[in-house]
Amino acid sequence: DFVDAHNAARAQVGVGPVHWTVDAYARQYANDRNLVHSATR
């Protein structure tokens, strides 16, 4: 996982870790929305 490698490099310079949250955001976004079809001509 590239986030683990990135966090290892950050730890070497004394910076805190980052967290991968785009998957949780996308899942929540999809669950909160309703599929609506547009009117056709």
Curated annotation (Swiss-Prot):
Keywords, alphabetical: Allergen, Pathogenesis-related protein, Plant defense
GO terms for biological process, alphabetical: defense response
Listed InterPro entries: CAP_sf
Family label: Belongs to the CRISP family.
Function, as annotated: Probably involved in the defense reaction of plants against pathogens.
Record protein name field: Pathogenesis-related protein
